[in-house]
C-alpha cells in the first residue's frame, strides 16, 4: 500500500495495467542517478511503446522530465503524465483502443 501521493497514483496505474494481462509488459524504473534519465514506467503492449510519468495530484513534470518525454515521443513512444483518475482513464482508453485494433503503431 502506497504511503505517498505519487505512490497512490502509481498503484492506480498498476491496476489499469493489470487488466491487460500477459500481453502487456511494464517495467517500473527505480532511479538511482546512474545512466540516462527515463520515465517511471516503460510499457510494451501488442507492439506499442508507451511510457508513463506519474506525479502527485496537481504536480507537473520537471524540466528534465519534459526533455525526456520529448525525446521518447520523437522516438515513437506514446507518453502519458498521470496524476490521478483522469490520467488513468486516458491510459485505459488508449490501451483498450490498442486491444480493439483502433490505435495504429506510431
For every predicted segment, state its role.
Residues 1-106:
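Catalytic phosphate/metal-binding cores of nucleic-acid and nucleotide-processing enzymes, i.e., regions
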Amino acid at each position: 500500500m502506497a504511503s505517498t501521493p505519487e505512490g497512490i497514483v502509481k498503484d492506480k496505474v498498476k491496476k489499469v495495467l493489470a487488466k491487460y494481462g500477459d500481453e502487456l509488459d511494464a517495467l517500473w524504473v527505480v532511479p538511482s542517478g546512474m545512466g540516462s534519465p527515463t520515465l517511471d514506467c516503460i510499457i510494451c503492449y501488442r507492439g506499442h511503446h508507451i511510457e508513463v510519468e506519474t506525479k502527485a495530484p496537481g504536480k507537473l513534470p520537471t524540466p528534465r522530465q519534459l526533455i525526456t518525454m520529448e525525446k521518447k515521443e520523437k522516438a515513437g513512444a506514446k507518453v502519458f503524465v498521470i496524476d490521478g483518475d483522469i490520467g488513468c482513464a486516458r491510459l485505459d482508453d488508449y490501451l483498450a483502443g490498442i486491444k480493439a485494433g483502433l490505435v495504429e503503431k506510431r
